[in-house]
Amino acid sequence: LCLNATVRNATKVKDGFQLTEPDSGVMWPVNIPDYNKRHVFLNHNFTLVASVTIEEAPSGNTPLLIAVLANTEPTHTMRILYTADNKWMTMLKDEKKPTTESGTWEPKKEHQVALMLQGNKASVYVDGELLGEEEVPLTGEKPLELFAFCFGACGEENPSQESHVTVTNVFLYNR
C-alpha cells in the first residue's frame, strides 16, 4: 500500500487492505524526522489518490483518509469521512465540525478519492467531484509541509467506531 507504512488490524487484499476493526488503520509517515524519512519533493504540492470500497454503513461519522500537514499545535489536517446516511464529509483545518457534507457513496461500489495540496490550497475530491477546498495557513512565509497520511483509525477519532472499508491502488503524485 505505502512505503514504510504501519498497518494495524487490517486484512491484506490485492493491491491494498481491508479495514474492519474499530482500530484498523494504515499510517504512512512521509516527512517525520523520527523515521529518517524525508520526502522533500512532497512538501507543498501533492495529490494522493486511492480506490475505496465501503462495505457497509457505519453507525456514525467514520474517518476514511486523513492527511496531517506539519507537526504543529494544533495539528492541521485534511480529512475525508463517510457517514451513516451515505454522505461524504470533509473536515479541513483542525475543525470539529464538517467543512462540507455532500455527495453520496454507495455500499460495495468502488469510489476514487483524492486529496490535493498545491501551495497553500487544499482540495478534496471524490469520483472527480470537488467536495471542499480551502486555504491552509502559512508558517512564516511558506506553506505547511506534509507530515503523514492515515487511512482508517488514526488514534484521534472515536476508537469504538468500526470501519468497513477496503483501500486499494494508493498513488501519491508530486504536483
UniProtKB/Swiss-Prot annotation:
Query: Does the keyword section mention Hydrolase?
Result: yes
Keyword Isomerase among UniProt keywords: no
Q: What is this enzyme's EC? A: 3.2.1.18
Q: Give GO terms: molecular function aspect only.
A: exo-alpha-sialidase activity
What keywords sit in the KW lines? Glycosidase, Hydrolase, Repeat
Recorded catalytic reaction(s): these are: Hydrolysis of alpha-(2->3)-, alpha-(2->6)-, alpha-(2->8)- glycosidic linkages of terminal sialic acid residues in oligosaccharides, glycoproteins, glycolipids, colominic acid and synthetic substrates
Q: Matching InterPro entries, A to Z?
A: ConA-like_dom_sf, Sialidase_trypan, TS_C
Q: Which Gene3D superfamilies match?
A: 2.60.120.200
Q: Which domain of life is it from?
A: Eukaryota
Q: Which family does it belong to?
A: Belongs to the glycosyl hydrolase 33 family.
Primary role: Developmentally regulated neuraminidase implicated in parasite invasion of cells. May contribute to the pathology during T.cruzi infection by cleaving sialic acid from cells of the immune system.
What further fact does the record state? The parasite mammalian stage surface antigen exhibits extensive antigenic diversity.
| Designated name of the protein | Sialidase 85-1.3
Source organism of this protein record: Trypanosoma cruzi
Its lineage reads: Eukaryota, Discoba, Euglenozoa, Kinetoplastea, Metakinetoplastina
Instruction: Provide the gene name from the record.
Output: SA85-1.3
